[in-house]
């Protein structure tokens, strides 16, 4: 959902210390259905903002993925992905649905940040 009558979409802020900056690897864009993010990065920059029951389910039930909402701040398109722990990383399954609309290359930098008002993960191509 793009905005609502109470809160605008939270824009990308360069100076936000909780931005999750991911440099895309060839694996992330070449026929991949997932994008991987390190657990330590998500612990520091994302988990603190999530609902505790969601987070407990994600961390304590390893074989049960959780659905997460990703919102493209530029196109205002929402995509639902599943997130699952994989060792010391988390994989976001369904990434290929975003790749179908975007023309990312290896080396592109994507910023992800939690939108507190809409309880979703926003993202933007920044470099």
UniProtKB/Swiss-Prot annotation:
InterPro entries: B3_domain, DNA-bd_pseudobarrel_sf
Entry keyword set: DNA-binding, Nucleus, Transcription, Transcription regulation
Subcellular location: Nucleus
GO MF term (any one): DNA binding
Any single Gene Ontology cellular-component annotation: nucleus
Domain of life: Eukaryota
DNA-binding region listed in the record: 35-127
Name used for this protein in its record: Putative B3 domain-containing protein At4g12617
Organism of provenance: Arabidopsis thaliana (Mouse-ear cress)
């Amino acid at each position: 959902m793009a905005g609502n009558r109470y809160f605008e979409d939270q824009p990308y802020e360069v100076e936000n210390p909780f931005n999750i900056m991911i440099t895309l690897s060839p694996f992330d864009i070449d026929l991949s259905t997932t994008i991987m993010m390190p657990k330590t990065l998500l612990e520091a920059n994302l988990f603190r903002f999530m609902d505790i029951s969601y987070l407990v389910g994600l961390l304590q039930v390893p074989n049960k993925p959780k659905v997460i909402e990703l919102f493209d701040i530029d196109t205002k398109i929402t995509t639902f992905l599943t997130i699952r722990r994989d060792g010391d990383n988390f994989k976001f399954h369904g990434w290929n649905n975003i790749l179908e609309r975007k023309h990312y290359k290896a080396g592109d930098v994507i910023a992800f940040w939690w939108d507190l008002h809409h309880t979703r993960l926003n993202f933007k191509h920044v470099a």
